[in-house]
Each structure stands twice: as structure tokens, then as C-alpha cells.
Curated annotation (Swiss-Prot):
Keyword Plastid: yes
Keywords assigned by UniProt, alphabetized: Chloroplast, Plastid, Ribonucleoprotein, Ribosomal protein, RNA-binding, rRNA-binding
Keyword Secreted: no
UniProt GO molecular function: rRNA binding; structural constituent of ribosome
Lineage of the organism: Eukaryota, Viridiplantae, Streptophyta, Embryophyta, Tracheophyta
Protein name, per record: Large ribosomal subunit protein bL20c
Described purpose of this protein according to its UniProt entry: Binds directly to 23S ribosomal RNA and is necessary for the in vitro assembly process of the 50S ribosomal subunit. It is not involved in the protein synthesizing functions of that subunit.
Gene for this chain: rpl20
Organism: Zea mays
Length: 119
């Protein structure tokens, strides 16, 4: 029985996987079976870490806001600041508040004074 070479479909599939693994090293770059395993693993990690990145950034923003509120005596804690913001219906998300807390803490103090005046 003569040998039948595989068609272009398998070659196209392998070159596509190889293009995903272009920055890998060693066997992860050269061997087809290892390439498919590592590319699948990389895709799983990237899918998982897209969700994790959102959680991590939210945690970072909350930490920055909490530190700024305690240092500059805006309110006693982060939770009281967020509670008063929502009670007064001021629409500032945590990302914006963290940016204000890091770049210009005086504006954070001004925001807290606005909340107290509305009371």
C-alpha cells in the first residue's frame, strides 16, 4: 500500500497553531503536539485572566480610595464615602474616584465637602 500524503487542511491547521505559538521557546515552538497543548493552555489562561483583571483593578481602585480617605480625613472609611455618594446620587465610579485620589487629593476633599453641604 502506498503512502498517502495529508492534504492542505491539516497543514493549514498546524500552521495556524504555529502562528499562535510564534513567541514560545524550545519544544513549545517546534513540536506540533506540544504546540497544540501549549496554545490551548494559553487560551485558557487568557480567558480566565480577562475576568480576573477586572476584579484586580476594582480591588486596586478600592484600596487607593480607602487609603486616600483615611489619610486626608475625607470620611473615616471607604464604605462611608461610597454610602454618602450613593445617598446623594453623585455618579462617580470607583475608577474615577481612584484617579482623583491619586492625582489630586484636594479634589477628593472638595467632593466630600459637597456631600456634606448637601446634607
Amino acid at each position: 500500500m502506498t503512502r498517502v500524503p495529508r492534504g492542505y487542511i491539516a497543514r493549514r491547521r498546524r500552521t495556524k497553531m504555529r502562528s499562535f505559538a510564534s513567541n514560545f521557546r524550545g519544544a513549545h515552538l517546534r513540536l506540533n503536539r506540544v504546540i497544540t497543548q501549549q496554545v490551548r493552555r494559553a487560551f485558557v489562561s487568557s480567558h480566565r485572566d480577562r475576568g480576573r483583571q477586572k476584579r484586580d483593578f476594582r480591588r486596586l481602585w478600592i484600596t487607593r480610595i480607602n487609603a486616600a480617605t483615611r489619610v486626608y480625613n475625607v470620611f473615616n472609611s471607604y464604605s462611608k464615602l461610597i454610602h454618602n455618594l450613593s445617598k446623594k446620587e453623585l455618579i462617580l465610579n470607583r475608577k474615577m474616584l481612584a484617579q482623583v485620589a491619586v492625582s489630586n487629593p484636594n479634589n477628593l476633599y472638595t467632593i466630600s465637602n459637597k456631600i456634606r453641604i448637601i446634607n
